[in-house]
């Protein structure tokens, strides 16, 4: 059983504040939610279990029980998850406020301990102080957190997470902030709490405390497309697709890291809760993570033999050719932008090959093919430029004054001509490596200009950002029929 979840269940009965703050979906009536196989810790109840996606950010960080309340760590309502979430630079005073919140919600004194023990001793089998019956009293106060970086902002979700060695398929990683506070001060807080426990429970409390307060922080993970709802990933091929998210909001005017102080001002806290409401947003999927996901899907379907072929049709329209026909049944081709990029990239590459190398048919096996597989993955800049450089070297360039040149005297389509004029200013007959890189970047940037894209999607924005963008009608970036250049 998750210690934090058990503590919330038992402590919510001691007063009105706790009954409101410590209410978890996992301790209420179960409601069905989409089943998944993603393993990790639910940020709401801190138990390790199968996770489902959050309706506020579409990331997998909530269990199927807690999902009924739709709480997200990016919310603006001061529920327990939001009050445990800190942002960016965390100071010693912030951590002191967090510890004070824990002490307020999970008090430990002789009266509380006796009350829980008396309530638990219902049968003879419960007369001994066994850990399974008193799990809620064994919640130490630690500065253990799950952290994540979203477009330059780092979030720390504090809690008590059991079984730290279990499988973690979420983008969150364990971070210990005890060094920012003070180990000895935190020890003193926990030793005082531990002194009220029966001797048989003190050892277990101490073991739990030291294991969760002395661990080494993990390296922070990189957020990728697999961390978001499969429903979003499956619809990326639709250019007009918008993600629907809901956020729990209120008139919370505190600084982000000061929300935990509200439990000290009970009347003010309940006044803020009276303003609670749900806001709905429809946001664009445009970001580097999802763009890279789409380009990678298209990269797996590349037919490199087209660059040596004599087909009169565009690369995605070749049929009945064993070496060049692209499988158009994949949904990635439903996005006309991906199709346009693929056609123009391969039209340009074929013109380079035909202008510089004597290869007559697509059935031939050439070394250049192995470098073509990465030409769409422009998000991985180093790998992409390496593949372009290798392709350039396969064209047998001529070197003059330490600069290598290749010819461009083969026919190209009008789209590529427009890109050449836009990027170079004319349709050249001689190109350097830098020219080739610039042209191929321009072909991709016409639809997916990653230079000006945020890394993560808008679903990871805070309420303040979403409201500002919604006011300026920018939650949907642009009409799907208009390119980034336009």
Swiss-Prot record:
Subunit structure: Interacts (via C-terminus) with host IRF3; this interaction leads to IRF3 degradation. Interacts with host IRF7; this interaction leads to IRF7 degradation. Interacts with host CUL1 and CUL3. Interacts with host BTRC.
HAMAP family (alphabetical): ROTA_NSP1 (MF_04088)
Keywords assigned: Host cytoplasm, Host cytoskeleton, Host-virus interaction, Inhibition of host innate immune response by virus, Inhibition of host IRF3 by virus, Inhibition of host IRF7 by virus, Inhibition of host NF-kappa-B by virus, Inhibition of host RLR pathway by virus, Interferon antiviral system evasion, Metal-binding, Phosphoprotein, RNA-binding, Viral immunoevasion
Domain notes: The integrity of the zinc-binding domain in NSP1 is important for degradation of host IRF3. The pLxIS motif targets host IRF3 for degradation; however phosphorylation of NSP1 pLxIS motif is not required for its activity.
GO molecular function, one term: RNA binding
Annotated motif pLxIS motif, positions: 480-483
Region span, Important for cytoskeleton localization: 82-176
A biological process term (GO) from this entry: symbiont-mediated suppression of host cytoplasmic pattern recognition receptor signaling pathway via inhibition of IRF7 activity
GO cellular component: host cell cytoplasm; host cytoskeleton
UniProt key word Transmembrane helix: no
Similarity annotation: Belongs to the rotavirus NSP1 family.
Chief localisation class: host cell
Motif IKBKB-like degron (ILD) motif: chain residues: 479-483
Region feature (RNA-binding): 1-81
Region annotation (Interaction with host IRF3) ranges: 317-486
Identification of the protein by name: Non-structural protein 1
InterPro entries per UniProt: Rotavirus_NSP1
Segments of this protein annotated with the region Zinc-binding domain: 42-79
Subcellular location as annotated: Host cytoplasm, Host cytoskeleton
Matching Pfam families: Rota_NS53
């Amino acid at each position: 059983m998750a210690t934090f979840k058990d503590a919330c269940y038992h402590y919510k009965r001691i007063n009105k504040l706790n009954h409101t703050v410590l209410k978890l979906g996992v301790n209420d009536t179960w409601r069905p939610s989409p089943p998944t196989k993603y393993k990790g810790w639910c940020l709401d109840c801190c138990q390790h279990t199968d996770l489902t996606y959050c309706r506020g950010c579409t990331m997998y960080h909530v269990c199927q029980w807690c999902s009924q309340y739709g709480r997200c760590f990016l919310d603006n309502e001061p529920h327990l998850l939001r009050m445990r979430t800190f942002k960016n630079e965390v100071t010693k005073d912030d951590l002191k406020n967090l510890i004070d919140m824990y002490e307020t919600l999970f008090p430990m004194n002789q009266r509380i301990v006796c009350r829980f023990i008396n309530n638990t001793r219902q049968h003879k089998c419960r007369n001994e102080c066994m850990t399974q019956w008193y799990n809620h009293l064994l919640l130490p106060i630690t500065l253990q957190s799950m952290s994540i970086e979203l477009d330059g902002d780092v979030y720390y979700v504090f809690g008590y997470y059991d079984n730290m060695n279990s499988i973690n398929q979420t983008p969150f990683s364990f971070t210990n902030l005890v060094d920012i506070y003070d180990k000895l001060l935190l020890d003193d807080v926990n030793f005082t709490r531990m002194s009220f426990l029966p001797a048989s429970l003190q050892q277990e409390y101490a073991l739990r405390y030291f294991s969760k307060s002395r661990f080494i922080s993990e390296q922070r993970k990189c957020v990728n497309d697999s961390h978001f709802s499969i429903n979003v990933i499956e619809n990326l091929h639709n250019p007009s697709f918008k993600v629907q998210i809901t956020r729990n909001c209120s008139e919370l005017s505190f600084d982000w890291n000061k929300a935990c102080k509200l439990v000290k001002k009970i009347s003010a806290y309940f006044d803020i809760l009276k303003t609670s409401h749900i806001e709905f947003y429809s946001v664009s999927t445009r970001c580097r993570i999802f763009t890279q996901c789409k380009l990678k899907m298209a990269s797996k379907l590349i037919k490199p033999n087209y660059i040596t072929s004599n087909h009169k049709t565009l690369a995605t329209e070749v049929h009945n050719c064993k070496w060049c026909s692209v499988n158009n049944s994949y949904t990635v081709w439903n996005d006309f932008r991906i199709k346009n990029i693929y056609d123009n990239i391969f039209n340009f590459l074929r013109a380079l090959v035909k202008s510089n190398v004597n290869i007559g048919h697509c059935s031939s096996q050439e070394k250049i093919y192995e470098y073509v597989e990465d030409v769409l993955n422009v998000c991985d800049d180093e790998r992409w430029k390496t593949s372009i450089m290798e392709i350039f070297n396969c064209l047998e360039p001529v070197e003059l004054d330490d600069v290598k040149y290749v010819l461009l005297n083969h026919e190209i389509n009008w789209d590529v001509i427009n890109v050449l004029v836009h990027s170079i200013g004319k349709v050249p007959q001689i190109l350097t490596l830098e020219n080739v890189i610039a042209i191929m970047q321009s072909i991709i940037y016409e639809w997916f200009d990653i230079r000006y894209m945020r890394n993560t999607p808008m679903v990871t924005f805070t309420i303040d950002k979403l409201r500002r963008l919604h006011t300026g009608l920018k939650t949907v970036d642009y009409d799907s029929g208009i390119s980034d250049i336009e």
